[in-house]
């Protein structure tokens, strides 16, 4: 009988804990991976532009 109150309290705590499905995804939710992919792609574009201008072949300048 001593364990019954502890068992009931644990059941109440488990039932009130938020689950994974507590917040349904909306169309505005974007996975973290896509943010990282976009950041990598943006950095690659910047790097290619910097290398391009360093070689002066696509910045409108001639050697």
Curated annotation (Swiss-Prot):
Tissue-wise expression: Expressed by the venom duct.
Propeptide: 23-48
Listed GO CC annotations: extracellular region
S-S bonds: none
Domain of life: Eukaryota
Statement: the UniProt record of this protein carries the keyword Coiled coil: no
Subcellular localization(s) per the UniProt record: Secreted
Post-translational modification: Contains 2 disulfide bonds that can be either 'C1-C3, C2-C4' or 'C1-C4, C2-C3', since these disulfide connectivities have been observed for conotoxins with cysteine framework V (for examples, see AC P0DQQ7 and AC P81755).
Keyword field: Cleavage on pair of basic residues, Disulfide bond, Neurotoxin, Secreted, Signal, Toxin
GO MF annotation: an example: toxin activity
Signal peptide range: 1-22
Major site of localization recorded for this protein: secreted
UniProt remark on domains: The cysteine framework is V (CC-CC).
Family: Belongs to the conotoxin T superfamily.
Protein name from the UniProt record: Conotoxin TeAr193
Protein's organism: Conus textile
